[in-house]
Amino acid sequence: MPWIQVKLNATSENAELISDMLVEETGALSVTFLDAKDTPIFEPLPGETRLWGETDIVALYDAETDMDLVITQLKASAVLDDNFAYKIEQLEDKDWEREWMDNFHPMKFGERLWICPSWREIPEPDAINVMLDPGLAFGTGTHATTALCLEWLESIDLTGKTVIDFGCGSGILAIAAIKLGAAKVVGIDIDPQAITASKDNATRNGVAEQLTLFLPQDQPENLVADVVVANILAAPLRELSSIITAHVKPGGALAMSGVLDTQANNVASYYSDNFTLDAIAEQQEWCRISGIKK
């Protein structure tokens, strides 16, 4: 059915108050926060909900809603200024599931690696194909950090190697490593949902026997590999640098992403004593740090 959308501008200080008011007083069915100024926010503290300095609030209503009454209620609210700006838009009825699926296409990384959603035809059946559908909020190859790691894995010889995917998420990097020739891969993640997602995706790709998955507290001691890839964030890459370094065999390779260009040199400094680092690779505002352990 069709919907009515109302967009308001807010600040980080009053956005949640406005959201509560839209739901409780005007009957909004959903409320979404959007960045009004294209300003990234990363690494909130545990339990913290960060919002942008200028935040757009988008509220969704049933098409039968009396929007004149909604606007009257908004104007009477103490949360909003008297002269607040708003935009009302009628949303056409669509097959939203089909619309969502249409946005995902097979993606190629390097010369031979493809990530393909299950509902799409495989472009190159003889290439290395990882079947992976979006879900569970974990990587599917669309983000620059995942792409940087996939391109790196595709560029090195993994034949017969052992690999650790540190922060495995969906398992996309671990599965790609196996399909690229790795003999055995270990995936580690703090989130039990990630372990479940990785296991399911590995089974779907026929590589479950080569993938072992651990929560950090369950992993064996002295776990090392020829290749380690860690697509997480700058803060844990700094805080866990000694642990990540210890996972790499002497002469082994390490690649890390989840790092902004403004953070890359600082993160690299935590590894430069133990690794001969490559030039930092960049895609959009994201970076990959890689090197060989001394």
From Swiss-Prot:
Keywords: Cytoplasm, Methyltransferase, S-adenosyl-L-methionine, Transferase. Its main location: cytoplasm. Gene3D superfamilies: Vaccinia Virus protein VP39. SUPFAM superfamilies: S-adenosyl-L-methionine-dependent methyltransferases. Pfam families: PrmA. GO terms for molecular function: protein-lysine N-methyltransferase activity. One of its GO terms (biological process) is methylation. The keyword Ligase does not apply. Transmembrane segments: none annotated. It comes from the Bacteria. HAMAP family: Methyltr_PrmA. This is Ribosomal protein L11 methyltransferase.
